[in-house]
Swiss-Prot record:
Annotated function: Monomeric heme protein which primary function is to store oxygen and facilitate its diffusion within muscle tissues. Reversibly binds oxygen through a pentacoordinated heme iron and enables its timely and efficient release as needed during periods of heightened demand. Depending on the oxidative conditions of tissues and cells, and in addition to its ability to bind oxygen, it also has a nitrite reductase activity whereby it regulates the production of bioactive nitric oxide.
Annotated positions binding nitrite: H65
Species, as recorded: Cerorhinca monocerata (Rhinoceros auklet)
Residues that, per the record, bind O2: H65
UniProt similarity note: Belongs to the globin family.
Signal peptide: none
Entries under Gene3D superfamilies matching the protein: 6.10.140.2100, 6.10.140.2110
Primary gene name: MB
Binding site for heme b: H94
Keyword set, alphabetical order: Cytoplasm, Heme, Iron, Metal-binding, Muscle protein, Oxidoreductase, Oxygen transport, Transport
Protein name: Myoglobin
Annotated GO biological process: removal of superoxide radicals
Record localization: Cytoplasm, Sarcoplasm
Assembly description: Monomeric.
Length: 154
């Protein structure tokens, strides 16, 4: 399931474009997640009041959390699959404190893919999309494995 060097290069190349505007990308990813999958809002106590796209657009807290999410994911992606030290604490908090189901990681992966495709269509062709999809799947699978270690079936 690992990625080739070329695939990692594609992932990190497009990720560089994401990092050029973490706040904008992160905000859009979370808005997309909550709009496409409203049930995910139940896991975020401080965002439960955000019911409309306008409320979400105006939320500085949502924007800040988007930066946090994409910053953490970026740290993991940059490890090119050797992400145990970055992944373990993230999995622990998501399994034991936040109780985020693996399915929700799939949902946010979809949102990430959609936002990148919308914002960077010219740079996110079929090969880059396939590589990113594979990298996000590796992340989710490894999170799911860690969840089990922490006793969370997610």
């Amino acid at each position: 399931m690992g990625l080739s060097d070329q695939e990692w290069q594609q992932v990190l190349s497009i990720w560089g474009k994401v990092e050029s505007d973490l706040a904008g990308h992160g905000h859009q990813v979370l808005m997309r997640l909550f709009q496409d999958h409203p049930e995910t809002l139940d896991r975020f106590e401080k965002f439960k009041g955000l019911k409309t796209p306008d409320q979400m657009k105006g939320s500085e807290d949502l924007k800040k959390h988007g930066v946090t999410v994409l910053t953490q994911l970026g740290k993991i992606l940059k490890q090119k699959g050797n992400h145990e030290s970055e992944l373990k604490p993230l999995a622990q908090t998501h399994a034991t404190k936040h109780k985020i189901p693996v399915k929700y990681l799939e949902f946010i992966s979809e949102a990430i893919m959609k936002v990148i495709a919308e914002k960077h269509a010219a740079d996110f062709g079929g090969d880059s999309q396939a590589a990113m999809k594979k990298a996000l799947e590796l992340f989710r699978n490894d999170m799911a494995s860690k969840y089990k270690e922490f006793g969370f079936q997610g």
